[in-house]
Amino acid sequence: MDSTLSPRPVSLRGLTIGLLDNTKPNATMLLEEIAKELQEHHGAGEARLYTKEYFGTPVAERLLEQIVDECDIVITAVGDCGSCSAATVADGIMFERAGVPTVSITSDSFLMSGQAMATVQGFPGFDFYAVQHPVASLSADEIRERALTALPEVLRILGVEG
């Protein structure tokens, strides 16, 4: 299996961001807060929100193809349970293999689940971000704090440290 990252962008200027929401509570808010920072402070272009059918399985092929066609980079969140953290990491690997730089976000309580899925997918060194647990029960202000904390790692994983 291919464990090569897709080519990294030189900058985010004008790039379309795909946000893949896995339907877990606060996933949309976390993704949108990160996208807002990438747009306002790093020149990223439009952010497009997509929603998976079910959090516990990898993204459907049809939706994967749509996002690959429409976006330059992808951020997917939030893996804050066993099956959804594994699926979030699997999604990131699928996008990388399709040629789209991706950041998968799990919670730190499920870091090992994400790492195990990366190994199962033949990509044991796959780099993803583990946000502080919990996510689902947080207020909007707390989600914003989590997004700001995640930002340097999101940039690093995308290869455009800012």
Model-flagged regions — what are they?
Residues 131-162:
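A charged, well-structured terminal subsegment
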Residues 60-72, 91:
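Short, well-structured alpha-helical segments in soluble
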Residues 89-112, 129:
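Short, acidic/small-residue loops that bind anionic groups at enzyme active sites
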Residues 40-53, 125-132:
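Short beta-strand elements in bilobed, periplasmic/extracellular small-molecule ligand-binding domains
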Residues 1-13:
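Short N-terminal or domain-adjacent regulatory/targeting segments
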Residues 10, 15-36, 45:
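Glycine-rich phosphate/diphosphate-binding loop of Rossmann-like nucleotide-binding domains
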Residues 54-65, 143-144:
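Structural motif
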